[in-house]
């Protein structure tokens, strides 16, 4: 029997939001020279969270359309990447505050972490409702170390595409944006597909790959910081 207690809700919210705020603090340091306005970062984060209840019925619709796993995962990935981009764009990317290449990556990662915070809260809440605190802690650890990083990486791929085309003409910017979306969607879908169809050792390898990509993202940030108008 499910018991929706105040303690379960508080633990799920803290478990979902606090770790993502730690990651947010970590990534915002990459933009330490010219930080974005706090109000726009907060808006991007909140809009990212608000995207989750929009994504859920859309993903349920996709799941009812087909039973082919890889198609479902790609459908879900498209929905989530588009919604995270919309959240980041509405939050700060459309404003004059986005005045340098790195800003798109910051806003997209912020929105992605907002999305991850709400999503993680729901996943952690499920076992807590049955009193299974251990499973809730395991879920928190897995999502902190894997799924949250995936959201960061996929949104950062789109942000990097925007960054590298920041000083280009509109046609080139659109082309880069499309390529960024394709990369993000493929990365997101393949991770979800493999993580659910791989044995424990394979899952470990996948998580190691995610961490290697995170290191690559740190190096990419340094490259983006050096982008200048030609």
Regions found by a protein language model. Name each.
Residues 1-230:
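Hydrophobic alpha-helical segments at protein termini of multi-pass membrane proteins
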């Amino acid at each position: 029997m499910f018991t929706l207690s105040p303690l379960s809700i508080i633990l799920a919210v803290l478990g979902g939001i606090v770790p993502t705020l730690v990651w947010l603090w970590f990534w915002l340091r990459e933009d330490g020279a010219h930080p974005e306005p706090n109000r726009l970062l907060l808006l991007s984060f909140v809009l990212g969270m608000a995207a989750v209840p929009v994504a859920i019925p859309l993903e349920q619709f996709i799941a009812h359309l087909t039973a082919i796993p890889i198609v479902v995962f790609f459908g879900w990935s498209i929905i989530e990447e588009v919604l995270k981009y919309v959240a980041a764009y509405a939050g700060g990317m459309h404003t004059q505050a986005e005045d340098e290449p790195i800003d798109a990556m910051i806003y997209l990662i912020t929105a992605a972490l907002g999305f991850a915070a709400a999503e993680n809260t729901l996943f952690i809440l499920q076992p807590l409702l049955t009193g299974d605190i251990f499973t809730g802690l395991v879920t928190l650890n897995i999502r902190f170390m894997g799924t949250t990083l995936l959201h960061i990486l996929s949104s950062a791929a789109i942000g990097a595409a925007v960054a590298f085309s920041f000083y280009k003409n509109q046609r080139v910017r659109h082309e880069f944006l499309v390529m960024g979306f394709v990369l993000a969607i493929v990365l997101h879908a393949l991770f979800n597909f493999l993580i659910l169809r791989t044995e424990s050792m394979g899952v470990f390898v996948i998580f190691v790959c995610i961490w290697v990509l995170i290191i690559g993202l740190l190096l990419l940030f340094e490259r983006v910081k050096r982008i200048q108008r030609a």
